[in-house]
Design a protein with these regions (language model features):
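Pocket-lining segment of extracytoplasmic ligand-binding domains
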Residues: 15-17, 91, 97-183
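Short, glycine-/small- and polar/acidic-enriched structural segments
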Residues: 1-93, 107-115, 122, 127-134, ...
Length: 183
C-alpha cells in the first residue's frame, strides 16, 4: 500500500486493517482517530428476528469475510449463545448488492448490511426492516462502542511535521463537525 511505502501520510481504513498495518510496520503506522462507529445492521424480510437468539437456525447473507463484519457477527453470535459454525448458516457475498439481490429474489430473508446501504435496501425491498442494530448488540456484550473505521497515519510523517499534522487534524475535526451539524 502507498501508506506503507511512504507515498501517503494518512488514510481512512477499516479498523481491522489498521491493526494489521500497525503490526506489519512495527508501529510505523498508527491510529490517529476513530472516524466510523457501528454501521452494521441485521435486516429481515419478515418478523421472526427480534433478538440475536432468534438467528438460530437461520441463514444470514452478508459481506466482509475475513474483515470487521465477519468478526463482529461471529463475536455477537457467540456471546449470545449462538454457535456461528453450527447454529446458523453464514453465506458470504462479495458485496452488499449481491446480498441484497438474494433477499430481493427470495433466496434469503436475513442479511447483515452496512449503512448507508441499509436505507437504500429498505426502499427497494417491500417489508424489509432493521431487526438488529449490531452496534447496540456489540455494546451489550462488550460494554464499548463498535469501531469500524479509523484514520491511520505514518508516525514519521507526524513526527517530522507536527504542526502540519495538528492543522490536518483540526481541519478533519471541522469537517466532521460540519457533516454532523450542517447537512
Amino acid at each position: 500500500p502507498l501508506l506503507v511505502k511512504g507515498e501517503l501520510d494518512a488514510a481512512a481504513v477499516p479498523a481491522n486493517l489498521a491493526a494489521t498495518l500497525y503490526n506489519k510496520t512495527n508501529g510505523a503506522v498508527e491510529v490517529a482517530c476513530i472516524n466510523t462507529l457501528g454501521v452494521l445492521y441485521i435486516v429481515e424480510n419478515g418478523e421472526t428476528v427480534n433478538s440475536v437468539g432468534d438467528l438460530k437456525g437461520q441463514t444470514i447473507v452478508t459481506t466482509g469475510k475475513g474483515a470487521t463484519p465477519e468478526y463482529v457477527l461471529r463475536y455477537v453470535l457467540t456471546e449470545n449463545g449462538v454457535d456461528p459454525d453450527s447454529d446458523v448458516t453464514i453465506e458470504y457475498c462479495s458485496e452488499a448488492t449481491e446480498a441484497l439481490s438474494k433477499v430481493q429474489a427470495g433466496e434469503a430473508t436475513i442479511a447483515m448490511l452496512p449503512q448507508p446501504f441499509v436505507t437504500s435496501a429498505m426502499s427497494q425491498v417491500e417489508g424489509l426492516r432493521v431487526a438488529l442494530d449490531m452496534n447496540e448488540e456489540w455494546q451489550k456484550v462488550t460494554g464499548s462502542k463498535l469501531v469500524t473505521g479509523v484514520l491511520v497515519v505514518r508516525k514519521d510523517a507526524v513526527e517530522n511535521d507536527p504542526e502540519a499534522f495538528a492543522a490536518f487534524m483540526d481541519g478533519y475535526a471541522a469537517s466532521v463537525e460540519a457533516a454532523n451539524n450542517d447537512l
